[in-house]
A protein has these predicted regions:
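Acidic Gly/Asp/Thr-rich repetitive segments characteristic of extracellular carbohydrate-active
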Residues: 14-74
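Serine/threonine-rich, low-complexity intrinsically disordered segments
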Residues: 50, 54, 71, 90, ...
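All-beta strand scaffolds that present successive hydrophobic residues in beta-strands
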Residues: 89-91, 113-120, 138-145, 165-168, ...
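Flexible, charged surface loops at secondary-structure boundaries
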Residues: 59-65, 69, 82-84, 109-112, ...
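Extracellular beta-strand/beta-solenoid scaffold signature
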Residues: 80, 101-109, 125-135, 149-162, ...
Length: 248
């Protein structure tokens, strides 16, 4: 089943809820690749490339802001990247990041002054605690997350903590989590989810696709297909904070 969410208030949303259908979508969902990103022309940013996970880790943790182009094919996240600069990571349809460590958070940022961007990055076939957990200002554009399982507790594929996170034109498919594929949690968090697709995702607890635990959340122009929360609390979206905006 496919539904487009439009003009609803803060409450639990299920894939089989009655909602205003604003547009129809095909069974096959494609994401156009973007080729241009504004990384801040008024600041000096070094460009580099990374062919392996270790090279990516070195670039992300070093001083000085970086634009990092992924030039390898498969990146095995066998350790944690703790961001040390405002990094922009640029992938392509030929590259992907994967991991098999249920206790690992491959990408982590607790510095509220950093700006982290993922552009055209594919994350797939993984078992981890959380894939991306970040404070600061975060942009995820044209990224694909597929076949990802997260660990026990309040875990998600993408977890926003004490910062601003914008997700645009991203796709989440066949992900199994505890707390939604995306979670916006905390008193000082803001999240905007626009033009994203959520297909065949499941949660052992709540929020099959998205768990909203902050009123500073906007979900717009997103499509939800066959998502499931085992506790039947928000098969598509679990809203736990009044004031969140969900529009078509």
């Amino acid at each position: 089943m496919i539904c487009s969410i439009g003009a609803v208030s803060a409450t639990d949303l299920n894939d089989n809820s009655t909602v205003e259908v604003t547009s129809s979508v095909d069974d096959s969902i494609s994401v156009d690749e973007a080729s241009i990103i504004d990384v801040g022309q008024n600041q000096e940013v070094a460009s580099t490339s990374a062919a392996t996970w270790d090279e990516l880790k070195t670039a992300c943790q070093s001083s000085g802001d970086k634009v990092i182009t992924l030039t390898g094919q498969s990146y095995n996240a066998n350790s944690q990247i703790v961001f040390g600069n405002s990094a922009t990571i640029i992938g392509s349809s030929d590259t992907y990041i994967t991991t098999n460590n249920p206790n690992l958070i491959p990408f982590f940022n607790s510095n509220s002054n950093l700006n982290i961007t993922f552009l055209n990055v594919n994350f797939k076939d993984s078992n981890c605690k959380i894939f991306i957990q970040s404070a600061g200002n975060n942009e995820l554009n044209n990224c694909i997350f597929s076949n990802i399982t997260t660990g026990a507790g309040k875990t998600s594929v993408v977890y926003n903590t004490q910062g601003l996170m914008n997700l645009d034109n991203c796709t989440f498919t066949n992900c199994h989590t505890q707390y939604g594929t995306i979670t916006n949690y905390g008193s000082n968090v803001r999240m905007n989810v626009d033009n994203c697709n959520f297909v065949n995702n499941t949660s052992s607890n709540i929020g099959g696709a998205i768990c909203i635990d902050s009123k500073n959340t906007t979900v717009a122009n997103c499509n939800f297909t066959n998502n499931l929360a085992n506790l039947n609390q928000g098969n598509a979206i679990e809203v736990r904070a009044f004031g969140a905006n969900i529009t078509g």
